[in-house]
Amino acid sequence: MTASTMPTAHPKRSLTPLVLVFLCALAPIVAAFVVYFNPQWWPQDQKNYGTLITPQRPVPEPGALGLTTLDGKPFDLRSLDGKWILLSVDQGACPESCARKLFIARNSHAAQGKNVDRLARVWIITDDAPVPDKVLTAYQGTVMVRARPDALREFLLGPQAATDDASALLGPIWVVDPLGNLMLQFPDNADGVSVRKDISRLLYNSRIG
C-alpha cells in the first residue's frame, strides 16, 4: 500500500465545547428555579403586595377537591399545570364582591401582553346556585368549576384553618404556580392595580410557565 492510498487518521474531537455550550444554556434555567424558590433573593425594591405562602401547598389529587365543571363533569386542577393560575372562590349567584374578584383576575390577565398565554383564571363555586348569564358572558375564558367548601379549606387556607369558617374562602385571590403549588394569596378587597403589578413581576422573574 502506497502512502497515497493509506487511510487518513482523523483526530478525535473533544466533547468539551459541546458540554460547555449545553451548561451555558442550562444555567439560566437552573438559576431561575433557585431564585423562584428563594423569594428572599428577589430584588428588595420589588416588594410583593400579596402574601407568599410558606411552605407552598401542592394541588391535591382530583378526588380530594372533587371539582366538577358546570355541566357536572370531573375536573382536575392539575390539568392546568404549566400555567400560572389566578384562583378565586365564591357562591354561584356571584354578588358584587365576587364579580369584583373576577374583574381583577380578568384585567390582570389581559394586561400581561406577550405573557398572556402563561396565565389561566379559575373560579371555584361553592354551592349549586346557577351562575347568572351576565357573569357567564362577562367572564368568558374563566374556568368555572364547583366544589364543596370543606374540600377546599385545607388547601387554600392551610391545615390550621377553622373548620367552620367557610366565609374565609370568599375574600382572597390566590395564585397557583406552573408547577402546581399554591404560592401567593392576595388580601380581601384586593387592589386591582397592585394585583396586576404583582402578577407582572412574577412572570418577569420566573422562567417557568
What are these regions (language model features)?
Residues T16-Y36:
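Hydrophobic membrane-insertion alpha-helices, especially the h-region
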